[in-house]
Amino acid sequence: MYACINLHFTDFCNFQCKHCFVNKENYELSFDELKQVVDKIYKYFNDNQINGRINLAGGEPLMSRNIGKLINYISSKDIEVSIITNGYYLTEQFLEKHKRQISIIGISVDSLEHQTNLEIGRCCKSNTLSKKQLLHICYKIKALGIKLKINTCLSKLNVNENFNDFINEVKPYRYKILQMHCDNENKINMVTATEAKIFLSKINYDYIYESAEEMKSSYIIIDSKGNISTDNLHSSKISIFDYELNDAINMLNINYQNYIKRYVLNE
């Protein structure tokens, strides 16, 4: 059996993406707390004979001073590690140091245009990652034998953009497109099913698409306070520090059909 736990251990981020679901309270689990979390995940995997992966996310995980220690600790348990990052702080030094510990690096690429990235909020002050910089990052990841994944959050701000040249150039092992879903003032930028269908019809590379509906209740997420939830709304108050992970997961209303489709059938 295969499973993936998404550990959104920090809220801190250098970008201000309008579609982001992360709390803006800027919490981050301490390293001692992270070790407790990893130990509970290890026990859950071991007790259930699961070949598991911990996916490190945020916020921006590479902003954490504990990221290296966290990767080392997870690896010491023989648990697979993956990271989702915006790429801004992804250095060659970091990649070289952890190339044998990280199986997958997912880069969030929502636009290749400077102005569009500014409108989305994918910027550090007024600085964005250029296509040239993204290409360099992607090539380095693949050269070190790490699987490259590209994520694109589809919104009205990028629905008319063509990513084909970029995707066919970097050739990720997985290209994932997610329909923007949020419940704040930025929901005006959510695309309709028809708009998404038109966008997808133009892609000439194998991709996986997840609608907002498919994402609901189909993840296992541990957030920056240690709360466990099944989607990106962080509505759960079930704390991993109060329960064994197996018991906590059983309390959640997980859509196992979509969970299995994402993590088992697509692995």
Regions found by a protein language model. Give the residues of each.
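A cross-family glycoside hydrolase active-site/sugar-binding cleft signature
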Residues: N6-H8, N55-A57, S82-N86, G106-D110, ...
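Short, well-ordered coil/turn segments that N-cap beta-strands
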Residues: I50-G52, K77-I79, Q101-S103, L144-I146, ...
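Conserved alpha-helical substructure of the radical SAM core
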Residues: M1-S82, L90-E96
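Radical SAM enzyme [4Fe-4S]-AdoMet core and its adjacent flexible, acidic
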Residues: L29, H114-S229, L233-M251, Y259-N266
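Short, glycine/charged-enriched secondary-structure capping and boundary segments
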Residues: K69-N72, E96-K99, I120-R122, F163-F166
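N-terminal [4Fe-4S]-dependent radical SAM core
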Residues: M1-N6, K43-Q49, S217-Y219, I254-Q257, ...
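Acidic (Asp/Glu)-rich catalytic clusters
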Residues: Y42-N46, K97-Q101, I167-K171
